[in-house]
From Swiss-Prot:
GO cellular component: cytoplasm; cytoskeleton; nucleus; plasma membrane
Positions of short motif Nuclear localization signal: 425-432
Organism phylogeny: Eukaryota, Viridiplantae, Streptophyta, Embryophyta, Tracheophyta
Species for this entry: Arabidopsis thaliana
Protein name listed in UniProt: Protein IQ-DOMAIN 2
Pfam families, per database record: DUF4005, IQ
Amino acid sequence: MGKKAKWFSSVKKAFSPDSKKSKQKLAEGQNGVISNPPVVDNVRQSSSSPPPALAPREVRVAEVIVERNRDLSPPSTADAVNVTATDVPVVPSSSAPGVVRRATPTRFAGKSNEEAAAILIQTIFRGYLARRALRAMRGLVRLKLLMEGSVVKRQAANTLKCMQTLSRVQSQIRARRIRMSEENQARQKQLLQKHAKELAGLKNGDNWNDSIQSKEKVEANLLSKYEATMRRERALAYSYSHQQNWKNNSKSGNPMFMDPSNPTWGWSWLERWMAGRPLESSEKEQSNSNNDNAASVKGSINRNEAAKSLTRNGSTQPNTPSSARGTPRNKNSFFSPPTPSRLNQSSRKSNDDDSKSTISVLSERNRRHSIAGSSVRDDESLAGSPALPSYMVPTKSARARLKPQSPLGGTTQENEGFTDKASAKKRLSYPTSPALPKPRRFSAPPKVESGGVTVTNGAGS
């Protein structure tokens, strides 16, 4: 409404006499000529007089639009005044040659000034509306061209792909969260059930420990049991890994230590240890020196006495007190029979055969007592190292025990009454096998002369 009021006020000012007077004064000041009659009087005279012979000009909207294309703003009052001023031709009067007179507008013939002004205003306003519609149409055309371009299509395709990927990732994350929540719920249910079972067991008193031992002792016992189980498993693994090696050694060894009916007979710890036992030079030297001294005193020991002495050693040795881990050393003490150095060759061969038969009988008895248990314990003792362990080395007490237990010593004679003669006879009743090459050879003792009897390694003279 404010714009319309301005338009009407500008039109009124354009057609008011005050504005015309001011315009005439401005024109007189510029040209130096004063017009006598006013414009209204001329208009009245022209309206009373007949119209001139000039043809009226037609109103063309296109010309107005072209003229106003550069001006995008709505028309102002100054433009309307200028248009009205330019449209009205000025005809000089005949009375005063320098006076400028305004003529009636020939553009709107037969119409009043108000109608002509209204037509002009409508024309200008319609041109403004047409320019605005053209501007909007140009914007739409540009937008359409931009949307139909290849760059826009590529961007739209990339945007759609990104949206699809984003939706897929969101669905996967949602599914994973649901699965994790379900797993957590299932785990919590299991924990609750386990806790409920533990509480029920505590209420019933099933897991109550009635022992008076402290917690540290109970834990120590459990730890010792666990360590014993692990040692047992290591021993079994060691025995299984060395089974083929011992089997090959038993096949290539002396057949006296084999049992054809039982292929695992030679698997006890005693035969394996005797087969792999190295020579102990210091102990052999001591035993040989003791044997030499005893042989110089008793040079007429026959075959039966040697066998009896071996039997006494086998029967009296298990009665001697020893620790749990000293058993292999005790076996070493009475399963390494020294051979008399002053006997002839035939008595030495028979003595070796008797000792072999006695060893085989004793090993058979030990094997009958514990077939699997002894093997496992022996494998456990050998699990530390495949060579001779440190605990198998004879100690001072074992060496001291070896000296009086020699077949020619005094201790064996004192313990002669405690031996089992029946068992000795039973052992000696087994048939002896023919002499075979011994797996171990002892060094020959030096030549000794005593009582007119000369004993050498081969024969006596």
